[in-house]
């Protein structure tokens, strides 16, 4: 921070800010010298430059320059300045304005601030203020530091260094107030009124002396501090060196054990900073041997917190003394104080490490190994609960841990499939008890899995133990259909039966019979697929299934043909895929929920004949009837809206066989076209007494009957805006020649014109 101090008592002191021009003059100036007549109105200009890039570089100080603009001149150290040429000033230069005794001295006070425990907003405000003041901001304490800025005093390594160097510890508001005082030309504020409060749980404001004490500069004189860790050495060695001590880093065995006999030798303990040390380094043998040797001599290691306590108390009799132990009465309080200060020195904030819990671990990952065996089911249920929130990013680690833990559980089995079966074994047994068996077929693992999936959502468990490509979940209104979905053979056959016999009315007994029939068809289709794959083991109950195999296969083939014909018919009518999807959904819903209306007797007869009698003669009859019915449906299907309205009264008896509740789709063009005019209407409008006949007459305006204006002659000369250099030069030469000719003619006339004035002689 630059300032200009007057050597005479009448003058004052002027402080300079960056980015501002200070004018020295006799009137209406920032620096007034009114009593000197040799001072001009604007005698000289002073300015300070300090780029923001030099804020963290203490070697790049701000620059004060002066520019003279006076009549009688300005001298710097006796040398007269060249007007209008600026000159940089140095600290200690003497500047004289004018020819009389207006002498001033230039002084520079470095302003290097070290910040500690400040948030981002406070740091930004501090940086802006110091840029205007021409100072610097550092993150670490150095020899050039002049102030330590803290909102509340905590015993950190920066605080210890500031106390040793006898530098003030102030709030960041001090520099804001200093900036305003310079701008308003008020007296500078006192830093003692900006000392922050003490924020240490183990220290009281009375016990912490923050005043400047010169004894702290030599607090560690003639002492040698031995560090066993490089990180401690790098952090604490500046404080020891500022206090007049010596430091050394031990990298191996002591070559001279007699060094420890010196009472001024202090070995810094590594036990208080185990969190900072790696496990391999803390167990090195030479560290252990050094500590054992020190203990054998009756000496103790020095905790790093005692360095700060020795500086605060300005004494090394109790602290940093390897031969002196703490008194028994104050041992508990001293240990607590050391814990707080050591944690503060390590981290830069006041935190008691004894209160902090150990690093948190996911203990639930080891629950399967620690709980008794009778609680295995409970732990599995917890895993299923974790699986429900598997999309949460924060629980990904716990999922992986619990997964690995469950696979190592001896009760879980060797594969994930066995574990899934064990998880829901009780539910499967309950399902077998509650669900009556419709057909006595052989139970398989797939049937058990289907039954368990129907009652409980095991898809989450499946995807948890093995990564499979899952299909998208259907809507809630189709959950029943998805859970009881049948193979393609049964679905197509049921669709064919429904197309032939639509539901009309039905009693309660027939509804139960249809549901039993659907279950029988599902189980029989599964058995047919198993037999086709090669499982030819026969049972007493397989006879009924094998009898159904022939008509079912025929039904599949005919249903495929019928569906193809239906698609062609729909394509001719320009129906969309949405119509087919609506029809299929209605059919699936009718299969699952059961028709609430009884069916007509042809369906009853055909179904019973196909399922219960199982006679092969009924299959061709049903197939022929289906084909005839399908052809009738295709032929009699309406092709337009007008035809449909015409056929409704004629085909009233056959409307029951047609699908109901369909969606009618119409395709219309979005392009608006003009209607074609009727020529007959136009011709008729011109005849007779039509009110739309034009009766007005075009009036000729003046000049309408004259000839058009023909452009020609001079109008066709091309207009070029570009300058022609040759033409301009030729014109210029012509003008010069004409002027030269006129000048010559006038000169010739003057030569040949003789009109002398008569001169009168005096007699």
Curated annotation (Swiss-Prot):
PROSITE patterns found in the cross-reference section: FHA_DOMAIN
Location within or outside the cell: Nucleus; Chromosome; Nucleus, PML body; Chromosome, Telomere
Stretches for region Disordered: 389-496, 535-593, 738-763
Alphabetical list of SUPFAM superfamilies matching this protein: BRCT domain, SMAD/FHA domain
Motif (Nuclear localization signal): 469-474
Disulphide-bridged cysteine pairs: none
Ranges spanned by the short sequence motif FxF/Y motif, renumbered to the chain: 748-757
Key words of the record: Cell cycle, Chromosome, DNA damage, DNA repair, Meiosis, Nucleus, Telomere
Entry GO CC: chromosome, telomeric region; Mre11 complex; nuclear inclusion body; PML body; site of double-strand break
Compositionally biased tracts (Basic and acidic residues): 423-433, 473-482, 742-752
Superkingdom assignment: Eukaryota
Annotated Pfam families: BRCT, FHA, Nbs1_C, NIBRIN_BRCT_II
CDD domains (alphabetical): BRCT_nibrin, FHA_NBN
Chain coiled-coil ranges: none
Keyword Magnesium: no
Skewed-composition ranges (Polar residues): 434-443
GO biological process: DNA double-strand break processing; DNA strand resection involved in replication fork processing; double-strand break repair; double-strand break repair via homologous recombination; isotype switching; meiotic cell cycle; metaphase chromosome alignment; mitotic G2 DNA damage checkpoint signaling
GO molecular-function terms, A-Z: chromatin-protein adaptor activity; damaged DNA binding; DNA-binding transcription factor binding; phosphorylation-dependent protein binding; protein serine/threonine kinase activator activity
Domain FHA: 22-81
Domain BRCT: 102-179, 215-324
Domains (record comment): The FHA and BRCT domains specifically recognize and bind phosphorylated proteins.
Described function: Component of the MRN complex, which plays a central role in double-strand break (DSB) repair, DNA recombination, maintenance of telomere integrity and meiosis. The MRN complex is involved in the repair of DNA double-strand breaks (DSBs) via homologous recombination (HR), an error-free mechanism which primarily occurs during S and G2 phases. The complex (1) mediates the end resection of damaged DNA, which generates proper single-stranded DNA, a key initial steps in HR, and is (2) required for the recruitment of other repair factors and efficient activation of ATM and ATR upon DNA damage.
PANTHER family: NIBRIN (PTHR12162:SF0), NIBRIN-RELATED (PTHR12162)
Protein name: Nibrin
Organism: Xenopus laevis (African clawed frog)
Lineage, uppermost ranks: Eukaryota, Metazoa, Chordata, Craniata, Vertebrata
